Amino acid sequence: MTSIISLSSVLGSQAPRLTALPPLSLYIHLPWCVKKCPYCDFNSHEPHNGNIPEDDYVAALIRDLENALPQIWGRKIVSIFFGGGTPSLFSARSIDTILTAARTLLPMEHLPEITLEANPGTVEAKKFSDFRSAGINRLSLGIQSFNSRHLKALGRIHDGDESHHAVEIAQRNFDNVNLDLMYALPEQTLTESLEDIQHACTLGVSHISAYHLTLEPNTLFHRYPPSLPDDDLAAEMQIMIEQTLASRGYTNYETSAFSQPALESRHNLNYWLFGDYLGIGAGAHSKISFSEKIVRQMRYKQPKEYLAQSALDTPLQDQHEVGRDERGFEFMMNALRLTAGFASEMFQQRTGLPITAIQQQLNEAEQRGLIGRDHLRVTPTPVGRRFLNDLLQIFLPDKKQL
């Protein structure tokens, strides 16, 4: 295997510099949910005694945003995403308060995409209408399945009928709706996974995300693993999902993302193209670029601690610069998830590094049939997309196993 070129040998002691800053998104984390799912490794928490300190948390978010302004001064927001947890547990009044503050404090691109995640078990028609009035223009529903037996196995609080009903209500209020679905579920058959994806297609939503269930560390499923489809069956499910969605007019523009024409997730595309994002709220992550450095941040994870630290104007638990030996891998780890890959010039625009810094790795990936490239673009091949971990491992700074 070809050895990695040391970036210090390419650049000497000169620090890489960005000549232009990438697009900037805003991520807002609302960490509470009705019930923690056994497969979930996100920063989500069941409220103590069922009570969410909603007003205090909204005030903390706005304070957090105000304190972050010097890092992003003058930069326009291209998208906003309310993630969780279950953001739809919050009132439309609170969402409106947060968005009003964001619009007051930050310049916005014309008609930014503003997404809110919702759980089918917390769907109310009036509430969705009020979310739209507050400024939400894209809804992401955590359906996971339309099969009640599988939903019960996943520990979800809704059943198949509620999944269908939630989509109907969402579509009455929003033109842009994403459904999160999962496959390779406990005891799931190929036919059952096909039924889920076909049902989603008949609803005609603008976007579908299809995720392979994985047993993440620090989850109940990791401690007590359920019986899951084997790798061969899971691969059959993935191929069948891709073929079914393609036949219904959806473009598989990213590993797990499928959209109707021109309705890709703008927020997630910014992530995948190594754009910037300011994350506020408990456990939220940020990536912020400056001309001479790229910084990653994480807010305090526990809601109670985040509230206390935000009141002291110290919400950051961790902050570090992305080393120049890490920038190439971080860019490729995201951009190679995209079916269309990336424009070659974007590598230098987003990392500050010449693309020659990863020339040997590109050569190796091409020789192994994992990417195709010309002087304009680098694109993962179908083989590279299917064996993405093998492709990404080529670009690891020290060749750690993924």
Question: What kind of feature is each model-predicted range?
Answer:
Residues V383-L402:
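Short, amphipathic alpha-helical interaction segments positioned at domain boundaries
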Residues G352-E364:
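Short amphipathic alpha-helical interaction segments
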